[in-house]
């Protein structure tokens, strides 16, 4: 009886730890403009991911922990010195996310694709 109670407690503890595991977010920033991106910063959930030297028709990637409800703050600086900034997208705990962030010459667009639920 004592062993079975310990086993049940261990299972409950393991399930609790699994449910508290941080979810992951990944993004691909695609340069769809005609100009090289000198640097880009993507901030979300208190984390900032820096990307550099993204040529036209190429991309860079980043990842973060989904530990808040929030949106991306994206800042792009082109090689010419021109900048674009946008707050967009949405993440929430309990899901993993895979996003494509497309940078054109005049806008930043995002495609949100939750990848699974951690229930």
Regions from the PLM with identified roles:
Residues 1-8:
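Bacterial N-terminal signal peptides that target proteins for export
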Residues 16-19:
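C-terminal motif of bacterial Sec signal peptides marking the signal peptidase cleavage site
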Residues 21-23:
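Bacterial signal peptide processing site
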Residues 27-34:
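Asparagine-centered strand-capping/turn motif at beta-strand->loop junctions
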Residues 36-39:
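Short acidic/proline- and small/hydrophobic-mixed sequence motifs that coincide with surface turns
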Residues 46-68:
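Intrinsically disordered, low-complexity Pro/Gly/Ser/Thr-rich segments with frequent PxxP/GP/PP motifs
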Residues 69-80:
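A short, solvent-exposed beta-strand micro-motif common in secreted/extracellular proteins
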Residues 85-119:
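Extracellular beta-sheet/turn segments enriched in Thr/Pro/Gly and aliphatic residues
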